[in-house]
Curated annotation (Swiss-Prot):
Family: Belongs to the HisA/HisF family.
CDD domains recorded: HisA
Active-site residue numbers: 10, 132
Entry protein name: 1-(5-phosphoribosyl)-5-[(5-phosphoribosylamino)methylideneamino] imidazole-4-carboxamide isomerase
Gene encoding the protein: hisA
Organism: Methanopyrus kandleri (strain AV19 / DSM 6324 / JCM 9639 / NBRC 100938)
Reaction catalysis annotation: 1-(5-phospho-beta-D-ribosyl)-5-[(5-phospho-beta-D-ribosylamino)methylideneamino]imidazole-4-carboxamide = 5-[(5-phospho-1-deoxy-D-ribulos-1-ylimino)methylamino]-1-(5-phospho-beta-D-ribosyl)imidazole-4-carboxamide
Length: 242
């Protein structure tokens, strides 16, 4: 499986933002047009990662923007944030999502999560489980506001039979450009044969290479791209090495 780099388009109140530790009040980047932002990234990358931050926190819904990105942008789109029912999964699939990232409900309601997986697989859509972890590598849910009561490795063991992959985010370095938590990557890839995407703290090409060497299927990058600290062309070269 070829290594992938996926730019993140995080949506809060209809705007594309970059946040520190997922906090909507701590913004390091803001744009009024998430669709145009996604379009710009699609010129370099085959996938776009769209997060409905409002939905993840139970504070809103940005379905219209998600739908426009899926329809207007020439890239595959993986969507996360607030997917807590089969009905919501169905809506996002109908909007054009190519992969869903599911977090909270996977830990809080086994039956609802199973229904989401069934709906996705019926449509040929992959489900990646979101593993958002703190500095102790414990999983957080509900927009990173609550402890799920399970460690990273135990969570992976729980979902290996039903998930298609994982998106592991090191929340404690998210948006800070202070380097990746390499142990998070190693623990994730060491606990599963499924593809693992990593996010959090990426500040340089070196960080991306470290994640790749640790076994990640790919990385999701936000802040470093938006701040111009990583050249998209260099990332293209890295992906093409495979």
């Amino acid at each position: 499986m070829a290594f992938v780099v996926i730019p993140s388009v995080d949506v809060v109140e209809g705007k594309c933002v970059q946040l520190v530790e997922g906090d909507p009040e701590r913004r390091t980047f803001e744009s009024d047009d998430p669709v145009e932002t996604a379009h710009q990234w699609s010129e370099f990358f085959p996938w776009i990662h769209v997060v409905d931050v409002d939905a993840a926190r139970g504070e809103g819904d940005n379905s219209d923007i998600i739908g426009r990105i899926c329809e207007e942008v020439d890239a595959k789109v993986q969507v996360g944030g607030g997917i807590r029912s089969a009905e919501r999964a169905e809506e996002l699939i109908e909007l054009g999502a190519d992969r869903l990232i599911v977090g909270t409900v996977a830990f809080t309601d086994k039956d609802d999560f199973s229904k989401i997986v069934d709906v996705c697989h019926d449509h040929g859509i992959e489900v990646f489980v979101a593993l958002d972890v703190n500095e102790n590598h414990e999983v957080l849910v509900s927009g990173w506001k609550e402890d799920a009561g399970v460690t990273l490795e135990d969570a992976i063991e729980r979902f290996n039979e039903v998930a298609d992959g994982y998106l592991t985010t090191a929340v404690h370095v998210e948006g800070k450009e202070m380097g990746i938590d390499e142990k998070v990557v190693e623990k994730s890839t060491g606990a599963t044969d499924l593809p693992v995407l990593y996010a959090g703290g990426i500040a340089s090409i070196k960080d991306v290479k470290r994640a790749k060497e640790a076994g990640a299927y790919g990385v999701v990058i936000g802040t470093a791209l938006y701040h111009g600290d990583i050249d998209p062309v260099a990332l293209l070269d890295l992906m093409e090495e495979d």
